[in-house]
Design a protein with these regions (language model features):
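Hydrophobic alpha-helical segments that drive targeting, anchoring, or assembly
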Residues: 1-101
């Protein structure tokens, strides 16, 4: 993962050239912070929905078509990546004492 940057919040999207994007962590009510909070909530909701879909696919006796399985696994990988980034961002804020959750 990325190294913690003092006073900055890791955002749930990439910056230029695919590098981590940060914003100052001194205004949790600012526009960028609120947008990041909303995006993190949406990412976590999507991850939960994908997990439920995967569980349903595993619960049936007949295996799903390979293309359907591949699609769900790819989306699960995306969701896990997003979830890990949210966890990293929140962990960084906890260690600096600026966490809002």
């Amino acid at each position: 993962m990325t190294d913690a940057v003092a006073g900055l919040r890791l955002l749930p999207w990439d910056g230029p050239n695919g590098k981590p994007a940060y914003t100052p962590n001194d205004n949790p009510e600012g526009m960028i912070a609120r947008l990041a909070d909303r995006m993190e909530r949406e990412q976590l909701t999507t991850a939960s929905e994908l997990l439920e879909l995967a569980r349903q696919m595993l619960a049936v006796t007949e295996p799903p078509p390979p293309n359907q399985s591949r699609f769900v696994v790819a989306r699960l990988c995306d969701a896990l990546s997003n979830t890990l980034r949210v966890a990293e961002s929140r962990g960084m804020r906890l260690t600096t004492g600026d966490a809002d959750e």
